Amino acid sequence: MTSSVINVLNKIKDLDIFEDDLYFVGGTALSYFIKHRVSEDIDIVSPKILKYKNIIPIMQDLGAKKIEDENTFSLRLAGMFPDEYILKFILDDVKIEFFCANRPIQKELLKQIQFTTYDNSRLKILDLKQIAKLKVIAFFQRDKIRDLFDFGAILENKIVSFQDILQISKELKNISSE
């Protein structure tokens, strides 16, 4: 993690919003555990619709600037209210993204939440294995080099088994094992 990310985490870690079902995940959370790369953003997931009416004013009171997500238009076309599913902010040059787990495999994974707290604060960080599984899902669903790098670190550190990876792949691709 960069010093900027650490400073922003220190600013947000005890906010009241983290009393809700919000969990620190993503490459920075993975890096927190295994120190495999420098990460410059903060991802927060919720298994539920985001409580945007709470999150937005609290983040703005800290000086965070809300930015639009590139999927906003698509969400509106689908009849959804974007702020319930994704919120992005910039605070001290660090991107903070809150998102609702909307894929069935993500929702299923988040039903068995195991977490610890970040630096003994209100900010909950998913356990390493759950973070790794969410990163494997991201790896299979988008084309970002950092996901490939994280996937390699997950394999190298034996965080999830080959069977877990195969199962995730099957669920995402809707492949039968028969």
Name every feature range the model reports, one short phrase each:
Residues 1-178:
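Compositionally biased terminal segments of proteins
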